[in-house]
């Protein structure tokens, strides 16, 4: 901006001065003192002494032009250095009148546009590589550096440890898997190995031990699951073999092995005296005739205490007999079956109630009935025949 010089006491000064005919004297923005000089400089509505208006950076006294940013006043060069476009190499401002070089979005001074390795200034047409930090490298130096890096990253030779050194390290590891620094220094001096080599050896050894323990645990669990699978397979094969075995196999379940009714002791007196001599409960085997009974008459009323309504050993009654029998009529409680028994008399016999009749003869079956033609079949010879030979159609 152009500086405005006002002469004190003149008519022009009276027109331009913001304090015409004012008793107050303006203060200088630089030294904060009253301005009583002949000339007053005015910049952005602020008054300055001629000697106080200077560049904030180079302290050059400004006479014709100045540049302002914030509260500072600058000359042209310093203003563009501070607030203008900066060089990507030296981070200094570039004046608008200076010739520059550009690489992508970066701007360089002419003397800053050079290789950082050989310091050679790059000219128009030269090939170069732009690094990530905006630095420049010529093609020759870049290829050389890349080749050296490839050679340096080649596989280094492995460190060889002798048997004696290995024994010393193993003994130290057995004492302490993670030794302190002074112990490693002592081992390094004893074995002649580098401190770094000793430290890496202990690290590798600890990692190896940890890996071996982990593998051992996996093997134990694997063996456990294999044994479980093998045992399950064996039990399954045993079941299959039992199903495939014939009737003579040990796995067959036979009812003939069970104890006979004569060997079973029940609280009820009905089955207490059954004998093997009468295979069909008193009748001859192979016939459907009557059966023999040995008794001394009809038992008294007090002999039926073993038979109750909820007793599991009571003689079942046919549905037809429920109506004909008197209420709570006692049944036969104790039966004795000797080898040669006496037959019970037929219908109308003395001593036998009319409501209960025991039919004897060559009829189709023995029956306990009240005149009904349909009754229960004879008791079979053995428990096995109860399950196999009973005709359920009769029920």
Swiss-Prot record:
Keyword Repeat attached: yes
Region called Disordered, residue ranges: 209-325, 348-395
GO cellular component: chromatin; nucleus; transcription regulator complex
InterPro entries xref list: HD, Homeobox_CS, Homeodomain-like_sf, Lhx3/4-like_LIM2, Lhx3_LIM1, LIM_Homeobox_TF, Znf_LIM
Segments of the chain annotated as binding DNA: 154-213
Entry's Gene Ontology molecular function annotations: DNA-binding transcription activator activity, RNA polymerase II-specific; DNA-binding transcription factor activity, RNA polymerase II-specific; RNA polymerase II cis-regulatory region sequence-specific DNA binding; RNA polymerase II transcription regulatory region sequence-specific DNA binding; RNA polymerase II-specific DNA-binding transcription factor binding; transcription coactivator binding; zinc ion binding
Polar residues compositional bias, start-end: 257-276
LIM zinc-binding domain span: 28-78, 87-141
Example of a GO biological process term: inner ear development
Cell compartments where the protein resides: Nucleus
Record keywords: Activator, DNA-binding, Homeobox, LIM domain, Metal-binding, Nucleus, Repeat, Transcription, Transcription regulation, Zinc
Keyword check for Transcription: yes
Function: Transcription factor. Defines subclasses of motoneurons that segregate into columns in the spinal cord and select distinct axon pathways. Acts in conjunction with LIM-1, ISL-1 and ISL-2.
PANTHER family the record matches: LIM/HOMEOBOX PROTEIN LHX, LIM_HOMEOBOX PROTEIN LHX3
Protein name in UniProt: LIM/homeobox protein Lhx3
